[in-house]
């Protein structure tokens, strides 16, 4: 039998990105958390954590985290059927990974009523849409929104739709860098904005225009900051259509190539044995996502 106090300590260290915060969340001393991790490692006969900053799970650690995540979800179902088992009486909580652009645009509208109706608290982890699935694979989250269709073992994926991005820049930037009009081959020689090192959307966009290779760019790991820097004329960027309607209407931003958007598919990944609440949320997102996302057409 598993000792779930030990597994909870492992989950807390990963979810809170360190021993100190894990101790605060569990109401224990940092040394007590460390002792539980050591005891767990002694019982499984191998390390469950890589001692880096932040700590990372080993292969067996990931398997244990997957187990903990699914047990938590099943326990929630049982507590809803037998309320007396819920000794703490706390609201439900789901840990979900999603990309910053979804969080900045459609996510709140899609889940707001659901969370209120089901007294659900969310623990959101922001990851680029191309790498969010690693959180599922590590057993750190109950579900994720990402651009990959293929689910991890033990999970399912559901196509929600696609986020449409358009290449935008300020009027001043366009006048300064494209006085004769915008041509695709000029884009690599003008400063761009990229969300982070895992963001390859600009590379895909340029490739779709027949332009390959390196390009000048700023890194800006903030969805809101990305828009502000684009408005300020620091570079051109691919921004969600949902996020810049007001800027377009006010003339703060202009589209570089109006007939050349790029769509990014968004899939909802969730554990196959995730329990009733996660199943209800999945059905809810399947019904509502089309209000914000465009249909995805495979290239």
Curated annotation (Swiss-Prot):
Q: Which InterPro entries match?
A: ArgP, ArgP_gammaproteobact, LTTR, LysR_subst-bd, Tscrpt_reg_HTH_LysR, WH-like_DNA-bd_sf, WH_DNA-bd_sf
Which SUPFAM superfamilies does the entry mention? Periplasmic binding protein-like II (SSF53850), Winged helix' DNA-binding domain (SSF46785)
What Gene3D superfamilies does the record tag this protein with? Answer: 3.40.190.290, Winged helix-like DNA-binding domain superfamily/Winged helix DNA-binding domain (1.10.10.10)
Which key words tag this protein in UniProt?
DNA-binding, Transcription, Transcription regulation
A single Gene Ontology molecular function, please? DNA-binding transcription factor activity
Record keywords: Magnesium included?
no
Record's superkingdom? Bacteria
Positions of the DNA-binding region: 19-38
Function (record text): Controls the transcription of genes involved in arginine and lysine metabolism.
* Homology family: Belongs to the LysR transcriptional regulatory family.
Q: What is this protein called?
A: HTH-type transcriptional regulator ArgP
Source organism (scientific name): Pseudomonas fluorescens (strain ATCC BAA-477 / NRRL B-23932 / Pf-5)
The coding gene here is argP
